[in-house]
Amino acid sequence: MITRYAAAANVAHIQASQLIRDAIADLDVRPVTSEDLRRGPILDNQSILTDAFAKVHATEARPIIFDGHCLVDVGEQPIEIPVDVIRQLQPSGVVLVHAPADEIVRRRKNDTSRERPVRTSDELATQQDRCIALCTDYAEKLGIRFGQVRAGDESGFAQSVSQFLGT
């Protein structure tokens, strides 16, 4: 959905996980996988992320859609991304793409390409609620807008992003 919007609207789609993987790979000789990132030091990776993003931001002429997570589910306790990390990204708005917990459970069950902690529908619903609270907090503390869009709602996503970009 985000990739399609970015291509149609001529905006850059920057994925947090890919930025971190590329930055770590530049420092290391071995390839970095999504699983390496999930199991690695999440908060340490945020410094790598913000440094890498600053380089992209300085050279990218198009508006940027930064595609990342506010909560990283790594095991016992999900890790929340601090507002200071979000502040360094200088967003003009935050759009939370969410889905019903039952749908997330189904998608995770069918996605054998990576390991994830096993979560019940109730646990995922709690995480989704926490994501809403985090994004609301980001918006309030940074003085930016916050919108929510259901996964797959391409027109809703386009409308939210267009408002933030002023297009």
Ranges and model annotations:
Residues 11-13, 94-96, 146-148:
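Conserved beta-strand scaffold positions in the cores of enzyme catalytic domains, especially
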Residues 16-79:
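ATP-dependent small-molecule kinase phosphotransfer cores
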Residues 9, 89-90, 142:
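Short, structured coil segments at secondary-structure junctions
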Residues 62-63, 132-167:
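NTP-dependent small-molecule kinase module
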Residues 11, 60-62, 92:
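Short coil/turn segments at beta-strand junctions that form active-site/ligand-binding loops
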Residues 26, 76-77, 106-108, 159:
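Short, well-ordered secondary-structure micro-motifs
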Residues 1-6:
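Glycine-rich phosphate-binding P-loop
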Residues 32-35, 87-134:
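A glycine- and Lys/Arg-enriched "phosphate-lid" helix/loop adjacent to the NTP-binding pocket
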